[in-house]
């Protein structure tokens, strides 16, 4: 069972895309937030978000806040949407505080989340695209040629099955 799933839904770099595409992505996000509230509640999922949320359109911020508030007491899987997110921005925002290596994670957007065990990279791209740069230092990566809009439950199951057969060493040697 997954305890935490973070979806890189919209990067800061995505603002460079054509306005028409951005508008479509925001429309899809808003529809998702409204349409999936019931399913999120029925499945006891807690919704969270990371990124520079205040840079999103006001209607998206409002719908996101409603979805987060309505699910905040759910105790099942945590579904985190990375929105207007950039790994470098996260590090810069965290570094604005007086920090040590021990306290650095406390200032990240993801401070209350565990580091990811598995990163699923869609679209066949062999790069991390400015995503969770601090947090994925020992994350296993699974790359699929399937693009995000076509990614389905069976693809997720395939990734998890592959991950289950890996030996995680966190920088150590094989046993």
Regions found by a protein language model. Give the residues of each.
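Flexible, compositionally biased loop and terminal segments
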Residues: 1-175
